[in-house]
């Protein structure tokens, strides 16, 4: 059976100007989970510390409604059962996984770049011929992520996408990120020698596949990102 490591951010602190916390953006974990579940893949949720919290803005009706909210509210849904089995990345065997998927939320900007154990799983997956993927702010996992075989950044020379700088401006967090020395995904790409591909609009359903690296730009792209991961894995 194909095994997926679905990564969550551990960061769950005040971030937004309205005093709300960032953390895991619900649908950016839920949508990939459901795509992989329906495909019959086995999914393990993990974070760097074994803990997580939700992004406050991701649980409002604009972003969480309909069937998604039903799954979220059902304590017995497979998604919530999997959350109860959340693991600390260091407690897992990186060799067990075929796919790495980095879910998002601004929290990832704080912990993914230095999440050595999550990153070890990602590089191991890639080294064994699997797919490494992320959506929205999830590509923060690529910051400081080097291919152990070459010592070079894993995404060097690759094309990726992720949440746009314009999107950060619209959300009013650009200055907050600058004060915290947090890189935008475009800046991560530039730092690591990748080419950032920008969608026409910040809320477009938009993904980029470059070999075994698959990325998506925002919550609206989470389903397609996971679908593209499956396509990349099956073509591999």
From Swiss-Prot:
GO cellular component terms attached to this protein's record: cytoplasm; fungal biofilm matrix; hyphal cell wall; yeast-form cell wall
Q: Which reaction does it catalyse?
A: methylglyoxal + H2O = (R)-lactate + H(+)
Give the InterPro entries listed for this entry. Answer: Class_I_gatase-like, DJ-1/PfpI, Prot/Nucl_acid_deglycase
Keyword Oxidoreductase on this protein? no
Q: Report the active site residues.
A: 136, 137, 168
Q: Which GO terms describe its biological process?
A: methylglyoxal catabolic process to D-lactate via S-lactoyl-glutathione
Sample GO molecular function, one term: glyoxalase III activity
What EC number(s) are associated with this protein in UniProt?
4.2.1.130
Record function comment: Catalyzes the conversion of methylglyoxal (MG) to D-lactate in a single glutathione (GSH)-independent step. Selective for MG, does not use glyoxal as substrate. Plays a role in detoxifying endogenously produced MG, particularly when glycerol is the principal carbon source. Important for viability in stationary phase.
UniProt subunit comment: Monomer.
UniProt name for this protein: Glyoxalase 3
Gene expressing this chain: GLX3
């Amino acid at each position: 059976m194909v095994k997926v490591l679905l990564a969550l951010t551990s960061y769950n602190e005040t971030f937004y100007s309205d005093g709300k916390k960032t953390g895991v953006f619900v649908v950016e974990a839920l949508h990939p989970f459901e795509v992989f579940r329906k495909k019959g893949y086995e999914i393990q949720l993990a974070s760097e510390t074994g803990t997580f919290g939700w992004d406050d803005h991701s649980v409002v009706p604009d972003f969480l409604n309909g069937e998604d909210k039903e799954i979220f509210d059902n304590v017995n849904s497979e998604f919530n059962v999997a959350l109860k089995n959340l693991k600390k990345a260091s407690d897992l065997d990186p060799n067990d996984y075929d796919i790495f998927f980095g879910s998002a939320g601004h929290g990832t900007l704080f912990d993914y770049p230095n999440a050595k154990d999550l990153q070890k799983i990602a590089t191991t997956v890639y080294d064994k011929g699997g797919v490494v993927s992320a959506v929205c702010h999830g590509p923060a996992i690529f910051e400081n992520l080097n291919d152990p075989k070459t010592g070079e950044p894993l995404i060097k020379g690759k094309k990726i996408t992720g949440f746009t700088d314009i999107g950060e401006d619209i959300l009013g967090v650009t200055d907050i990120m600058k004060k915290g020395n947090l890189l935008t995904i475009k800046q991560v790409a530039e730092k690591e020698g990748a080419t950032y591909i920008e969608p026409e609009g910040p809320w477009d359903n938009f993904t980029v596949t470059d070999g075994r690296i698959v990325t998506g730009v925002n919550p609206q792209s989470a389903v397609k990102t996971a679908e593209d991961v499956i396509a990349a894995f099956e073509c591999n």
